[in-house]
Amino acid sequence: MAPHDPGSLTTLVPWAAALLLALGVERALALPEICTQCPGSVQNLSKVAFYCKTTRELMLHARCCLNQKGTILGLDLQNCSLEDPGPNFHQAHTTVIIDLQANPLKGDLANTFRGFTQLQTLILPQHVNCPGGINAWNTITSYIDNQICQGQKNLCNNTGDPEMCPENGSCVPDGPGLLQCVCADGFHGYKCMRQGSFSLLMFFGILGATTLSVSILLWATQRRKAKTS
């Protein structure tokens, strides 16, 4: 058996440490921007931390609770001095729980949560209403310093209006208090009345012809102005 060279181990250890550091940095850089929008990390006693620690295969990174695929399931932006959730907020549309308490939020948040169909717990400052109101949540509980919206309702099951969507469309939830009508397979256009696949070739052909016509018109106008000046 060949003698073991201690020098090779000395060389290997720093290399392995550098590799682990590089992988850690790469993972940190791969975090969605919303997770690092606010300095610090998820507070240990927050509901987001409790959800993440009591659900298997979830982990806390910065302000997010992620699964092993990197999908955001929890977001804790409490006490971040936010007047609005910010342009990256929709990166968290897969969340089950969000904490926004202790922020000076302003304006109506109704459309802020469009697409957040999995959201089940939303913690807001006490002065901010739950998006969609009582019709969008099973329970709304107000406390001295926050308001908790719990159990997002499926408005498509609660509207009681079968004529809300056209004949060839169906109702689909689109976030708290929001819904949309989606055309059935094979239908598209206004009120889902057009049948057959949407022709991209025709669309881009019309778009190209229109753009060309406008360009020629502008060019001719500029030449006319140049001649008269």
From Swiss-Prot:
GO terms for cellular component: intracellular membrane-bounded organelle; lysosomal membrane; nuclear envelope; perinuclear region of cytoplasm; plasma membrane. Glycans are attached at N44, N79, N157, N168. Weakly expressed in hematopoietic cell lines. Residues 221-229 are cytoplasmic. Keywords: Cell membrane, Differentiation, Disulfide bond, EGF-like domain, Glycoprotein, Lysosome, Membrane, Nucleus, Signal, Transmembrane, Transmembrane helix. It is found in: Nucleus envelope; Cell membrane; Lysosome membrane. Disulfide bonds join C156-C171, C165-C181, C183-C192. Residues 1-30 form the signal peptide. The chain crosses the membrane at residues 200-220. Residues 31-199 are extracellular. It comes from the Eukaryota. The keyword Membrane applies. GO terms for molecular function: xenobiotic transmembrane transporter activity. GO terms for biological process: cell differentiation; negative regulation of osteoblast proliferation; negative regulation of protein catabolic process; positive regulation of bone mineralization; positive regulation of osteoblast differentiation; regulation of gene expression; xenobiotic transmembrane transport. PROSITE patterns: EGF_1, EGF_2, EGF_3. Induction: Up-regulated by all-trans-retinoic acid (ATRA) in several tumor cell lines. Residues 152-193 form the EGF-like domain. It is a single-pass membrane protein; Multi-pass membrane protein. Interacts with NELL1; the interaction promotes osteoblastic differentiation and mineralization. Interacts with SLC37A3; the interaction is direct and both proteins are mutually dependent for their stability. Promotes osteoblast cell differentiation and terminal mineralization. Plays a role in inducing the cell cycle arrest via inhibiting CCND1 expression in all-trans-retinoic acid (ATRA) signal pathway. In osteoclasts, forms a transporter complex with ATRAID for nitrogen-containing-bisphophonates (N-BPs) required for releasing N-BP molecules that have trafficked to lysosomes through fluid-phase endocytosis into the cytosol. This is All-trans retinoic acid-induced differentiation factor. It comes from Homo sapiens. The gene is ATRAID.
